[in-house]
Amino acid sequence: MPRFAIIFALLIAYSLFLSTLFTGSIPDRANTVTSNAPCQVVIWDWIRTRRICNCCSRLCYSLLGRSNLSRTAKRGVCTIAGAVLATAAVIVAAVLVGKSSGSATKRGLTKTISVLNHTIPFTDHILNGQTLSNGTGSNFVTIGFSGYAVHATIKRASTTDIISWVIPESMEPTLARVASYVSSSSINLAAVPDTGGNASALSFQNAVQEFATSWVSMTYDQSYGDLRNVANDEGGEEILILMRKRSYRISFQVIETGSTALLLRTRRVVSQLITMTYLVTVQARVGIQIGDIFQHYGGIDNYVMTSISVLRTLEDKAFHENKLLIVREPPNKSNQDANQSYRLRPFSANDLIQNLKSVDIGFLAFCSFFDKYAHYPEIIMMKITIFISKGNLWSIIYVIQARYVRKRVMKVRGQMPGGLLTNMESLLNIVSTPNLNISEFHIQTHSMSQSKPMYFQKQCYSSQNNIIYIYNSIHITCGAVYVIVHDVRTPSVFVLIELRNCKPLKNSWCETTKTSPRDTKIKKNEYNETVCRRAGALLDGRVRTIRFLMMRTHWSRVKGVSCNTANRLSRFCNHVVSYYPSQNATIHLLPTSLRAESLEQQYTTRPLSSSNNRFCCLKSIFINNCKKACESPSLVSCNLQQTAELLMVYYLYICEACYVSRNHDLLSKQCMSTVRAVYVARMRLPKFRSTFPCMPRLCWLVNGVVVV
């Protein structure tokens, strides 16, 4: 019995020691924060799953069966004790993570450790571990350097650390919440040191394989000799990871491109498209430069990284400057102060395109704010959204909303600020990727006076391999203006611009209050609000129509549309297609010559003069434009099925305008049921999305928030 008691006491002591090692969090630097969730050790999980561990655990459990410990304590102690008796590998793990508590300088391992006839060297400046060679076994190659080092060994002109943070998955991508979270959870990380003949390299580590902060892992390895010069010149590569889930990481990694020039690349652990909903960042009065991880460091003359300045609201009726994007210039070699030489300047399209070419997947920022301004009628909201798709994965690469007070805008020669328009032109140019190519783009606006509405003119530009279309926007004096850029070769890529005027103009809607007998008893403001909702719902339906078209889904899938109605619409499309000379003709079905004024009256409650003739005229113009497009040799071919669907969209779009405005004289009785069914389906987003299996892939704008 005394012998068993001694063994039992030793097992308990050693078990407590191991449990402290494997379940406790390792102290970190004063200016770093460890992960919220405790780190798990893969080695321990591996040991516990072995059959020999179970056998030893049962043996210990039988020896301790008569003790006074609880059943849970018995199982825990026996499992640990069984693991100790089963294998000597735990000794290796215990030695590797056996760091003393205290400051960082007191937690370093000894220079060499001999375990199982294998010597593991550790240098003095490695404070938190080192990647082990394969000689110690495959289960011991996951210990990584954790992101801090002695500053004396860093070759940098400045010792400024990297500033980073983590945005939890549950947080909504709203500006205010992210700003408050970032201000309270900023984390400073020092760079990887550069020493002698050892170059530092980066690698991803799974969340359960890290012994320190679970969202940063820097692996130190001597085998990356090809990066040695880069490390010596730049002071070591840096990695910055932001995540929502512990196993889904986003990193900014520096790589070597065969020359001294370095590129900023992005990748994700799960090989999915990166979405900037993960990386919404804001600081007080300053737009955070995402990806600009070398902002304060010297020795990076070869870097030209794109910086993003996110507009943030300072007060309720603030007028925001139109510097939507900024690019940091390379430092002037004559200037000794690297920090001051990296000044900010207004960005251009060429800067952004050149930078995006050096990135695996071009991306920008997404933010959704200004919702509290909805009750201010004097404020105009601008929203720019760019969607990019590769395969079946959708990614929002840019959404920005800017809001301008009407009085301040009116002071700029009655038009929108030229700087904003310039940035809008540049923003649309970021689609100059292998999928899209826009040689030039111009946005024209009209005066914002009360007597004349503003809208965007139609534009159509072609390049060598692609043709870009911009749907001619139909301006509604209260509601919104949409401009859609569409590439016929890549129907899953398009650009949507929304210009919303929250206050009705006097030239149209206010006059209808005097002539509409059914609204004479309604107050003016209430009537305007009703019309605004109606117009906004209509345009929202139109946008969904375009997105519906991009998925090439047939109209017969819409609930409530019978086969006869679908066949009738198909015959209508075939009738238009018959105007083309051959089945292989290039078809472009966009109302490129329609003016905004030509369809503006269809959205009012006043009856149209010669409505049937007006529709026939519009259809004739539409077909003539298609015939002219076929004669252009630079245009690419298009599928006839897609053409029929697009024409159907245009036809139903006009019918919907008449249906909403109660202009039933334009609609025949045969089409009324179809238009009503399609209109109702679009107005009910959940029902409309559930109709098509492919709809969850799309990104929908619902109350100013993008829903995937």
UniProtKB/Swiss-Prot annotation:
Q: Tell me how activity varies with pH.
A: Optimum pH is 4-4.5.
Keywords, comma-separated and alphabetical: Cell membrane, Membrane, Signal, Toxin, Transmembrane, Transmembrane helix
Specify whether Phosphoprotein is a keyword of the entry: no
Carries keyword Transmembrane helix?
Answer: yes
* An annotated GO cellular component: plasma membrane
What subcellular locations does the record give?
A: Cell membrane
Q: Which residues cross the membrane?
A: 77-97, 380-400, 466-486
Coiled-coil residue spans? none
- Propeptide cleavage-removed residue intervals: 28-36
What start and end residues bound the annotated signal peptide?
1-27
Q: What is the relationship between temperature and activity?
A: Unstable above 30 degrees Celsius.
Q: How does it sit in the membrane?
A: Multi-pass membrane protein
- Mention one GO molecular function: toxin activity
Purpose of the protein: Kills sensitive strains of yeast.
Quaternary assembly: Monomer.
> According to its UniProt record, which protein family does this protein belong to?
To yeast YER187w.
What's the protein called, per UniProt?
Killer toxin KHS
Q: Which organism is it from?
A: Saccharomyces cerevisiae
Q: Which gene encodes it?
A: KHS1
